[in-house]
Design a protein with these regions (language model features):
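A recognition module on extended beta-rich or small alphabeta surfaces enriched in W/G with H and D/E
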Residues: 95-125
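Short, surface-exposed, charge-dense and proline/glycine-enriched linear segments
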Residues: 32-39, 85-96, 118-124
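Negatively charged, low-complexity tracts enriched in Asp/Glu with abundant Ser/Thr
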Residues: 7-62
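Short, highly charged C-terminal tails/helix-capping segments
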Residues: 124-137
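Intrinsically disordered, low-complexity regulatory segments enriched in Ser/Thr/Pro
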Residues: 77-105
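Conserved aromatic-histidine-acidic binding/catalytic patches
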Residues: 30-33, 64, 98-101, 105
Length: 137
């Protein structure tokens, strides 16, 4: 799926089509996505969460990865919006131990780290008029 040579899968692919956790994650990401347009230093954001910048080659403006469990990596993939298309923040997973994780746990980790990234946005943009969600974490 990407140029990094790893199979990247969604929570829906891990849990199945009826995954309630994919809907939970999608809703949480949609509410927070606009704030990530304020990220000026992607490397700094990656360090803030203990992750690293990755180039997945899927048309993203930036993506970060974070190992959340031995053999389980989460990828936060951001695409800036423009006049024609809205922006998006998506999450994908990879790793040899992905199938031993519960969807509920993966969703929890995703939301936890996205909220932590919002703190970074708030701390690095002290004078900006940020989306309200940045002030709720």
């Amino acid at each position: 799926m990407g140029s990094i040579g790893k199979k990247l899968i969604s929570l829906r692919e891990i849990e199945g089509v009826a995954s309630p956790h994919q809907r939970q994650v999608d809703s949480a990401l949609a509410a927070r996505q606009k704030a990530f347009e304020y990220v000026k230093d992607v490397v700094g954001l990656a360090k803030y969460i203990g992750g690293k910048v990755e180039s997945l080659g899927i048309g993203e403006d930036w993506s970060l990865s974070k190992e959340i469990f031995p053999g389980v990596r989460v990828y936060f993939v951001f695409v800036k919006g423009d006049e024609e298309f809205p922006g998006s923040l998506k999450v994908l997973f990879s790793g040899k131990n992905i199938n031993v994780m519960k969807g509920e746990d993966l969703a929890g980790f995703v939301i936890l780290y996205v909220n932590h990234m919002l703190r970074y946005v708030r701390e690095t943009n002290p004078d900006a008029n940020l989306p309200e969600v940045c002030y709720r974490v």
